Amino acid sequence: MIKLDWNEYLEKAAEVNAEGAVLLVNNGVLPLDKNAVTQVFGRIQLDYYKSGTGSGGMVNVAKVTGITDGLIEAGAKLNEDVLKAYKDYVAEHPYDYGEGWGGEPWCQEEMPLDDSLVKRAAESSDTAICIIGRTAGEEQDNSCKAGSYLLTDGEKAILRKVRDNFSKMVILLNVGNIIDMGFIDEFSPDAVMYVWQGGMTGGTGTARVLLGEVSPCGKLPDTIAYDITDYPSDKNFHNRDVDIYAEDIFVGYRYFDTFAKDRVRFPFGYGLSYTQFEISAEGRKTDDGVVITAKVKNIGSAAGKEVVQVYLEAPNCKLGKAARVLCGFEKTKVLAPNEEQTLTIEVTERDIASYDDSGITGNAFAWVEEAGEYTFYAGSDVRSAKECFAFTLDSTKVIEQLEQALAPVTPFKRMVRTAEGLSYEDTPLSKVDEAARRLGYLPAETAYTGDKGIALSDVAHGKNTLDEFIAQLDDNDLNCLVRGEGMCSPKVTPGTAAAFGGVAKHLEELGIPAGCCSDGPSGMRLDVGTKAFSLPNGTLIAATFNKSLITELFTYLGLEMRANKVDCLLGPGMNIHRHPLNGRNFEYFSEDPFLTGTMAAAELEGLHSVGVEGTIKHFCANNQETNRHFIDSVASERALREIYLKGFEIAVRKSKARSVMTTYGKVNGLWTAGSFDLNTMILRKQWGFDGFTMTDWWANINDRGCAPDKNNFAAMVRAQNDVYMVCADGESGSDNVIAALADGRLTRAELQRSARNILSFMMSTHAMARKLGEDEAVEVINKPAETVDDGEGDRVFLLDGDLTIDMSGVKTERNLDYSFTVDVAQFGQYRMEMTASSTQSELAQMPVTVFSMGTAWGTFTWNGTGGKPVTFAVEEMPMFSRYTIFRLHFGLGGLDMDKIVFKKIRPAEAQVCRLRISERWLQTQTYFWLKANFQSKKLLRGRRAYR
């Protein structure tokens, strides 16, 4: 029996929270005096954003420690009058969940500050903290508007009153990624710190930094410019149909430190400490790279950690280069004053090389080191790094010769650095015949033998080969094997994203287990309401620059996955922070691909150490949420290789990633779910990947030049994208696999190839070990007792037309959840009615929030009804997922539930039924449908009626 100590898990996450906090301004106000009274302003002190929105943040937790909670638990003295005022305000203005999936507001309504309250508070101390909160996420990019990237008038009013009344003002940013920092010029705060979104322990780690228990040691994973228009991608970001990556390799600091140094407010890698460090470094050339040795000494008066960052300046020859490129980093231990530590940073030739996508160096489609001087810089950020080593290469060296792959087909001009400065040039276009390339790599078919009585366990135990097992599978078996089943498949852990592998009866009879996927990367999403651990977001993790610490944290997550029988976490997210307004930046790490790949590799090493897997996503160039199902990301092969694929390559080569998810959209004209160049040529042939790949949930697939089709599994399998996520039932579907086998568009050998990828992976999972009775259980200890919904996995109701569910006797205690599953026989639009009564006073308020598949559809508040039944309704609720999980969250007790009624308003359109489109697609379409048809919240408020 393996034990997972919940207290150790909490402590490790709090360590990450503290190390990821990035202090940008400090005029001597931090750390706070623990014995002095501190005022905290901003409602987010009571509504802490633990993560962004969408699948990457939907982790159900028993407790979230916000910033105020963390300060109080650490023994800080807060102004009770100010805290009470905010508690009263939040009680009257509860958290706004918005209009369902993709419709959450970016921020919460702020409390207007009463002048007398502020003046009284200022009499008790001279220090005030102001907390600004932001969220965004799946289907919802940020916007350069007040309440998102910019501050609201209400927030500015708070900052103005605090600035006018307090001599020391601290601003904390509880955000998923960077926001506009113009408030520094307007309000001159004495301290500013990004504390990001820290998961369920965010306030604990933040308090440790504020109170000086931990010296801040986080570093910016992104460049903060003066204006949003300073970012070179801004001209094309948010285009709905085609996004031209005209800035090419010049993303983030690569652009600013090459062309626009004066437009940087805070440079990449920057972050202050409560102490000071002295860094001295030197380097030496090796056969396969460079080794930098850096000595770090704490020359200040407080203990702390420092990050040594190594940057390369490559010769700007035929291939235009960025002025600086991060190629290595290490973090010290905690150094006491006058203590020093020596760090060794190894830089490989692959980290030094550039990709020639045109042949301008004489080496087309190769990683090369051009002749010239290579200079290395070491320091605490990209700007302060000092030269520490240089070497000269006499002639151009080919590091790796490849074949052209994934190059653009659409002509465009790309940014380039010449001897004269910034210029633009024609981008090299694809010369590849994709159809011919695929035929050139067709695998050999294994002859069909029929059932020989070989079970997958026989392969696992070495009695038979995998090819002998696969030879038994007929076309239908192979077809079922490339289907994932979900969401919330009953074959795996309740409330998870998908089952894969043994999703059909005959596959199960052959001994193939059903593997389980759960949404990530901020922890496990369990839509039945099961509580899990919510981790710090990706941006915060990157800001730690601490590889070993992140590996330790994800080892705990891996054990939690095992305890919940989850085999694959759908994360880490690895897309690049190409633009600050991308809604899912909170899930991703950085604008830099080396930092991205290195931190993802650290996460994977933690998961792998306990035998579970992380699915690296979204492969690749998923850099905006606007129209993400159809957007065409048009980028040069060089930009893809050096920026947008680089992090994935590091994760595959360094940590042997074995699970990959493609995107919803297109890259250079082809939906990634069916891209042979991406899934076979680059991932497998060039990088050596030996795992399995999956689509994103209900993704489009196409053949070059053809319309997208969610049923085109043939194109998916030809590309060697192995599993379609997801189908309502693994036994059947409306895909085109059998038809494509019949007419020759798909070969049986290609289906067998995907089967081999899937089954090879399955045999390495704990799902297989469980099926063989060989798995070691994980026991979670020291997890606080919580009110649980004991029957959550057993309540399944068939919805075939209308349905009435008896709710009498259901407990409605404060913060209790009640979950049930509806097996939807007929997809369509339904009215959901909830009837309840209460003998509480007429002024009593008993809120109930309705969640469907983890998404809040609305909050309905009953007052005392004198014992009479009162009905609220969601007037129209689209239901397109066969197993739809509902969760009711009771804010307070005192409510007597009567019944829930589902009434079908109209069936789904025939095309929708044929495609068996399910929850995540539905949520996307529902959001836009709501926006188009209802400008108010009338639909979600429902209707109240006495009977």
Curated annotation (Swiss-Prot):
Upper classification of the organism: Bacteria, Bacillati, Bacillota, Clostridia, Eubacteriales
BP terms from Gene Ontology: cellulose catabolic process
The protein's Enzyme Commission number: 3.2.1.21
Pathway(s) annotated for this protein in UniProt: Glycan metabolism; cellulose degradation
GO molecular function terms attached to this record: beta-glucosidase activity
Active-site positions on this chain: 696
Family to which this protein belongs: Belongs to the glycosyl hydrolase 3 family.
UniProt entry keywords in alphabetical sequence: Carbohydrate metabolism, Cellulose degradation, Glycosidase, Hydrolase, Polysaccharide degradation
Enzyme class at the top of the EC tree: hydrolase
Catalytic activity line of the entry: Hydrolysis of terminal, non-reducing beta-D-glucosyl residues with release of beta-D-glucose
Protein name per UniProt: Beta-glucosidase
InterPro entries for this protein: Cellulose_deg_GH3, Fn3-like, Glyco_hydro_3_AS, Glyco_hydro_3_C, Glyco_hydro_3_C_sf, Glyco_hydro_3_N, Glyco_hydro_3_N_sf, Glycoside_hydrolase_SF
Pfam family of the protein (one): Glyco_hydro_3_C
